[in-house]
Amino acid sequence: GIVECTKFYQRDMDARSLLNLKLGETPFDNINEIINSEKGFSCGSGDSFVNKKIEMDLDLVDMEAYALAKVCKLEGINFKCFKYISDNADANATSDWIENCKKGAKLFQIKMKNL
C-alpha cells in the first residue's frame, strides 16, 4: 500500500573515516535529518540503488525524498511525502519493481483523490 513518510535521512553520505560523524551526516551541514512527525515512516535517500540490507535503521529507501524535504524545510514549505513500496531491495528488486509499478500508480490515484 501507500505509506506516509515523515522522517528523512541521507543514507549514502559516509564521512565516518574522516570526521567523528555518523553514517548519513554531512560535514559542516547543520541539517542531517528532517523529522516532520514521529508518526509515519522513516525514509533514507541516496543516489544508489539498494539491493541488500544497509547499515541505517530505516523503514524504506528512495533516491529523492530527503532532498525535497530539505529544500522545503529551508524554504519554510510544508512537505507531505507518500511512498509506494515497490520491492524489498533484494536480488528480485528489478523484477518486483516492474511488476508492482502499475499497482502503485493506481493506488496513488486513489490516495490523491482522498486527500
Question: Model features per residue range: what roles?
Answer:
Residues G1-L115:
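Glycine-rich phosphate- or other oxyanion-binding loops that anchor nucleotides, phosphorylated ligands
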